[in-house]
Amino acid sequence: MNTFFKLTALAGLFAITGHAFAVDDITRVDQIPVLKEETQHATVSERVTSRFTRSHYRQFDLDQAFSAKIFDRYLNLLDYSHNVLLASDVEQFAKRKSEVGDELRSGKLDLFYDLYNLSQKRRFERYQYALKVLERPMDFTGTDTFNLDRSKAPWPKDGAELNALWDGKVKYDELSLKLTGKDEKEIRDTLTRRYKFAIRRLAQTNSEDVFSLAMTAFAHEIDPHTNYLSPRNTEQFNTEMSLSLEGIGAVLQMDDDYTVINSMVAGGPASKSKAISVGDRIVGVGQTGQNMVDVIGWRLDDVVALIKGPKGSKVRLEILPAGKGTKTRIVTLTRERIRLEDRAVKMSVKTVGKEKVGVLDIPGFYVG
């Protein structure tokens, strides 16, 4: 069911004492990487395809009809809201949808990479357009409507129709912030940061992102509970299943271009140091005997990979404390094996009338 929202009336540079942190804006489409399949992906594709076609409990033929279904799923994973690609883009690639099965068997995934690269280009164009729309005077006096769910809608037939969709999206974003009490300047500043951040994320995509999405489309078309796990996702899955990891015991999240401490595991290295607080930002990571690496603007999973390491090894963090006008400091932590107790089963006994009832709280499933 489509959802409509009725519109009615109603920094690249962050300066801190002693330091200046800057993340360059992406202003040209040639700054977005053209992604290509890596050597190992061909082998993995061949093996995954062989395993799925021979051993999956759901028997299927990887024929032209099934290939078309994988293509459609992949296309919708790339552009779920049908507001990035044009109808002509979709038509151009749809001519090749019957080739999907052959590409998966051979490991030569040209269609997946070509379509992904085009979607990256189109997404860059959309956010650049949105930034220009922000320069217009804001007007909430009309009775416009904005469709929040376009997953079943046709792709726009031309640039004018696509621009009209994004005019509505920007106005919806503006009004959403207006309803929180922000003034016009605050709204523009917030959305400018948001759209530029989205553009910078485009420049951080890599070949593994494309391959994982292609394999996910394949797996989910066979069965919604079948998944492909990339090496990094496999590591995360193993952590969740064992409820343990080797690191500093901190939960991180992104806030604009900063990696922020969201919470800390009690008894972990970060918590025990007393030198790190929730809300602090990690702006640099250094290994023993190596220079500090500036991680402002990095993908969160890349920052996490840099911080994690073997038990007993040391990691240096350049911490920018929460708040404005603060200076960075270096905190050295020794990595430990962290037990994720908050995700383990908890038991309690409740008194109900004259009876006692045992209650198990199961946050998730794990081994051991």
Question: What is each residue range found by the language model?
Answer:
Residues H56-F66, S81-D89, L111-F112, R126-T141, ...:
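Surface-exposed patches in mature extracellular/periplasmic domains of secreted proteins
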Residues M1-F21:
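Gram-negative bacterial Sec-dependent N-terminal signal peptides
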Residues K36-E37, T53-L62, R200-S207, D223-L245, ...:
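Cleft-lining beta-strand/loop regions that shape enzyme active-site pockets
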Residues D79-S106:
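Active-site-surrounding "flap" and adjacent substrate/cofactor-binding loops of secreted or lumenal enzymes
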Residues E37-D79, D89:
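N-terminal-proximal low-complexity accessory segments that begin disordered
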Residues D24-V34, S45-Y57, K95-E99, R193-F197:
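Acidic/histidine-rich, surface-exposed loop or edge segments in extracytoplasmic proteins
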Residues N76-L77, S98, F112-Q128, M138-Y172, ...:
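PDZ/PDZ-like domain segments forming the peptide/carboxylate-binding groove
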Residues A20-A22, D189, T205:
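Boundary at the C-terminal end of the N-terminal hydrophobic targeting segment
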